[in-house]
């Protein structure tokens, strides 16, 4: 029995929710870190103001620190809009897409002994093409990463490389034999019931309007709408 378009959209919505849940620790850290620095800065500023002799220069340094961290917090909060599937957004370049998704998931994958390797050809370049629908592309790439993570046993690394002028190639490689013997690396794997399998990834790609293909341990995706 083939899933209806409505059912496919519900599956895709569930996949997007799961991907956001997996990215939340990194997003939470980006917002919590400035708050910790702000609290410490306010405490130090309070002590300096209460001291018998106020040092204006030291107080100004604390104020500058707090102002800087407020700016970092604002950037982190505003980044939440990147997860909204708006009808149109500012778009994203291929290099920025890979950099953002790798930064979001590097710690989580690293805890499981999975390295994320980015080809030098994906470094930012002047005049690089900006692809529309940045939010959709973030979900697509994170979904591809999650699919390889969930579907390949003893995965040790995912390599990111350009595929032509408008695509990405993700290649999974096995974990080193010594690392594969450490059960601690599998403690944080997603429950099988929440695994992003082939049906889940294809439903996500179809709903977002992009082409994704997998051959063995290699997954390819196109950044242009299908």
Where is each model-derived feature located?
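Glycine-rich ATP-binding loops of the HATPase_c
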Residues: 206-220
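Conserved DHp (HisKA) dimerization/phosphotransfer helix of two-component histidine kinases, i.e.
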Residues: 41, 58-117
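Glycine-rich/acidic phosphate-handling loop/turn and adjacent ATP-lid/helix
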Residues: 163-202, 224
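Conserved ATP-binding N-box helix of the HATPase_c
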Residues: 21-44, 48, 130-163, 194-208
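Histidine phosphotransfer helical core of two-component systems
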Residues: 2-3, 9-12, 16-23, 31, ...
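Conserved catalytic submotifs in the C-terminal HATPase_c
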Residues: 115-128
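An N-terminal amphipathic alpha-helical segment
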Residues: 105, 109-112, 145-178
């Amino acid at each position: 029995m083939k899933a209806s378009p409505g059912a496919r959209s519900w599956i895709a919505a569930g996949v997007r929710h799961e991907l956001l849940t997996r990215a939340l620790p990194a997003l939470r850290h980006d917002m919590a870190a400035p708050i910790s620095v702000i609290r410490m800065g306010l405490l130090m500023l309070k002590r300096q103001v209460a001291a018998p002799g106020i040092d204006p220069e030291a107080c100004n340094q604390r104020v500058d620190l707090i102002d800087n961290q407020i700016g970092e917090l604002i950037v982190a909060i505003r980044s939440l809009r990147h997860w909204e599937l708006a009808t149109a957004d500012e778009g994203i370049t291929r290099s920025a897409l890979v950099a953002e998704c790798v930064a979001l998931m590097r710690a989580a994958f690293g805890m499981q002994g999975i390295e994320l390797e980015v080809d030098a050809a994906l470094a930012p370049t002047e005049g690089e093409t900006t692809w529309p629908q940045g939010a959709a592309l973030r979900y697509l790439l994170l979904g591809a990463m999650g699919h390889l993570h969930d579907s390949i046993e003893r995965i040790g690394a995912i390599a990111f490389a350009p595929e032509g002028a408008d695509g990405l190639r993700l290649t999974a490689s096995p974990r080193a034999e010594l690392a594969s013997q450490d059960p601690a690396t599998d403690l944080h794997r997603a429950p099988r019931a929440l695994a992003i399998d082939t049906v889940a990834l294809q439903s996500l790609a179809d709903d977002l309007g992009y082409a994704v293909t997998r051959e063995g341990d290699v997954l390819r995706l196109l950044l242009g709408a299908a």
